[in-house]
Amino acid sequence: MARKKASIDFEQSLADLQALVERLENGELSLEESLAAFEQGIALTRDCQGALAQAEQKVQILLERDGELAAQPFDAEPEA
């Protein structure tokens, strides 16, 4: 259940960030509104980056060695 909540929180933060970007790109906000939206966008970006960093740390590759499963950190770079 906690995984779904974290996923929903990330997805909601990302959707909110996208909506803020659209509002800023429209150019219809006042300077004060734009600054407030930018500040909120920075906070949402940090939240999303934190969630992605946590997810990356949790992702592990299971390898079978001598009949036992061993965890290895996830390597995002494919091997050549």
Swiss-Prot record:
GO biological process, one term: DNA catabolic process
InterPro entries in alphabetical order: Exonuc_VII_S (IPR003761), Exonuc_VII_ssu_sf (IPR037004)
GO cellular component: cytosol; exodeoxyribonuclease VII complex
Species of the source: Pseudomonas entomophila (strain L48)
Family annotation (Pfam families): Exonuc_VII_S
Quaternary assembly: Heterooligomer composed of large and small subunits.
Compartments where found: Cytoplasm
Family listed: Belongs to the XseB family.
Enzyme class, first EC level, given as a word: hydrolase
Catalytic activity: Exonucleolytic cleavage in either 5'- to 3'- or 3'- to 5'-direction to yield nucleoside 5'-phosphates
Function in brief: Bidirectionally degrades single-stranded DNA into large acid-insoluble oligonucleotides, which are then degraded further into small acid-soluble oligonucleotides.
Keywords, ordered alphabetically: Cytoplasm, Exonuclease, Hydrolase, Nuclease
A single MF term (Gene Ontology): exodeoxyribonuclease VII activity
Source organism superkingdom: Bacteria
Protein name according to UniProt: Exodeoxyribonuclease 7 small subunit
E.C. number(s) listed in UniProt: 3.1.11.6
Tagged with keyword Cytoplasm: yes
